[in-house]
Swiss-Prot record:
It comes from Trachypithecus obscurus (Dusky leaf-monkey). The gene is PGR. Residues 1-48, 66-255, 331-378, 415-454 are annotated as: Disordered. The modification Phosphoserine is found at residues 20, 81, 130, 162, 190, 213, 294, 345, 400, 676. Composed of three domains: a modulating N-terminal domain, a DNA-binding domain and a C-terminal ligand-binding domain. One of its GO terms (molecular function) is steroid binding. Its main location: nucleus. This is Progesterone receptor.
Amino acid sequence: MTELKAKGPRAPHVAGGPPSPEVGSPLLCRPAAGPFEGSQTSDTLPEVSAIPISLDGLLFPRLCQGQDLPDEKTQDQQSLSDVEGAYSRAEATRGTGGSSSRPPGKDSGLLDSVLDTLLAPSGPGQSQPSPPACEVTSSWCLFGPELPEDPPAAPATQRVLSPLMSRSGGKTGDSSGTAAAHKVLPRGLSPSRQLLLPASGSPHWSGAPVKPSPQPTAVEVEEEDGSGSEDSAGPLLKGKPRVPGGAAAGGGAAAVPPGAAAGGVGLVPKEDSRFSAPRVALVEQDAPMAPGRSPLATTMMDFIHVPIVPLNHALLAARTRQLLEDESYDGGAGAASAFAPPQSSPSASSTPVAVGDFPDCAYPPDAEPKDNAYPLYGDFQPPALKIKEEEEGAEASARSPGSYLVAGANPAAFPDYPLGPPPQLPPRAPPSRPGEAAVTAAPASASVSSASSPGSTLECILYKAEGAPPQQGQFAPPPCKAPGAGGCLLPRDGLPSTSASAAAAGAAPALYPALGLNGLPQLGYQAAVLKESLQQVYPPYLNYLRPDSEASQSPQYSFESLPQKICLICGDEASGCHYGVLTCGSCKVFFKRAMEGQHNYLCAGRNDCIVDKIRRKNCPACRLRKCCQAGMVLGGRKFKKFNKVRVMRALDAVALPQPVGIPNESQVLSQRFTFSPGQDIQLIPPLIKLLMSIEPDVIYAGHDNSKPDTSSSLLTSLNQLGERQLLSVVKWSKSLPGFRNLHIDDQITLIQYSWMSLMVFGLGWRSYKHVSGQMLYFAPDLILNEQRMKESSFYSLCLTMWQIPQEFVKLQVSQEEFLCMKVLLLLNTIPLEGLRSQTQFEEMRSSYIRELIKAIGLRQKGVVPSSQRFYQLTKLLDNLHDLVKQLHLYCLNTFIQSRALSVEFPEMMSEVIAAQLPKILAGMVKPLLFHKK
């Protein structure tokens, strides 16, 4: 690159050029440009002294001087078009394709006036009047009327500019001495992160003197082969000056970037070659056609926009850190609020920052307050996460600098109004991914060339708003976690940037909820999100997240509505319904073994042991008792197969209600006998009441007690009583449930075989019931005490019959037990060949055995006592066979010797004795015993 010297008093200004950096001076302010008050006409750079530690007094407002520069504007328009042509031709030499559209400028003369001030020689030989500040964008003058000249400052300035302009010779300076001053941000740094530096000591509010700071312009350094700029630039980004948007000669005010209007240097990332080639060719073609301009303005037309302020980089670093760590940022917010860009403008946060010797620290975005400036919007992101590095591409050139201004507005048309307090900002919206092309909602006259490069970003979305989505804007909060949720998951280089396309559409997804005054999500939102998430996992728990008004409408759940699946014996988990009861497998096996093994369990306690899952094996007696009380029957499942109607019809068509009471443990003993499969009739207490109702009335013997007892008269009275009782048995048997279902021959046979047993058993009951077993109560008119028994001829037989009431007294037999035992006596003797209706007989007998067990359970509580009583009662029934046998023998002998003994036998009784007693005594009958002898 050839050596460049400033020959003309003016330098072209490219409208829309992004800001360029100056090493050590990344200061930004409102987009207002003002020339140097004291123009210097020297070929060399101005020599100014270093800025003091404090910035107070450096920036102050300047009144307008009312100067007019019409000739400068005309000359600037012509020179600017020439320079743009040369710049386009120079870009074409890079050999890459692509094109970019540039909007025509609106007021190129005004821009040239600013460039004239920038490139005006500072020597005493040349002097050009500078336009007043009122004819440019603002009436604020950046510096005082006279800047003190400091000779040592010139070499430093030259060292800064020499690598940028590729100057050779002694003006290049020592690059090693300014290595720290050449530090810039990485290539991928977002052009949106400018540093807001308010004037120290005075907030930008209405009525207060405002001292805006200069903003840096855009500088892009492009790498060129064979040039000395690569060695002298140090860590600067290598690039070539470019023009994002040029101003045509048609007139009109071109959009001015903040850096171009306010001063300073900014860094623009390297532009893609496919978009910059036509511009370089245009500049190279028009470069020779720019008379009256300095070589610096011709070649580096986009390099410098406003005067370079040689500020102390150490001061800037200290001031930058102070601004980043300061709690109050009202000055920067006020300065940013003057020209706040539209909410849909993505380029509001797209101005780059050049850092001198700053570390990789965070920079607030352009026109964005500090974290605590607007706490209502809940910006939880720390400053270290507010910087965004983007990939190299054409994003910088795609952003139009006109987006910083109101649409259709001229930056020179803004009058000098005092800055008011910052306006209320819209809620923050999430930015887009880095590397994504930004389509700017700029004025209609400025078209933007966009280039999107694919980039992936990890977005941390932790909240999902249910209401309307927040409005997109430059104050979008970074997607970070809420307070207390830990650090943000996004890396520094993966933070998303504002998406212009989403902002222009205005329909971006709402990713942030409404926040409270403390920056935290409202409780109603948290409950709604929690309730929404619970609908997918745990729906019954939605009642815990409901308003108070819905609390009374929520369904109430209780244990009654849940299915019972526990063992009724021990409380363990039930495996099914075993033997008619819902039990576990352990209790099922225990009950089966206890019933089949005929174990005689005894409780070591008081028959009230606790039977649960842990202690169920401690007391088998109490466990078996509980099984019987629950209703477990060994043949319970087998009995369900038979039809109830058929069995009821078998029981003499007497309707028996189904058992509903709690079964007792006496059912254990019923399984020790051979049951028929048709035993579906379970005799229950109502059946016992039926037996009580069919009990025969009191039968009188017709004995004359006024006469002394003789053997013949006493026996004759007993025979008459027997005849009446036999008729009563026939009548009772016909009313007995199930008996008439048997064959008629079977009915007669059973009555003939059991009539003696029934009469003696009734005698014992009456004796036990009326005289407590002290006498033989044959009838109310025939009661034999011991004295009368001794005087009789059948005293031995009376002693035999007297045993029955004594057993009743001993066992304290109840009426229910007596009624059941009486029925079993009717069914305890059958012929050897069996009965014609043997099956129905067995079913009927088994049913009454179970009824006896129930009758025992009405008084005996516990398995062991019930079993013992069942044994005693059934043993008594077995013993009656021998006793009745003695009566049969005595009756048959008396019947045979009736004439000799002068004893009368009634007709029916005579037929029964003559027909059946010889068979019974001959052993031609089969007694049914409960116990083996």
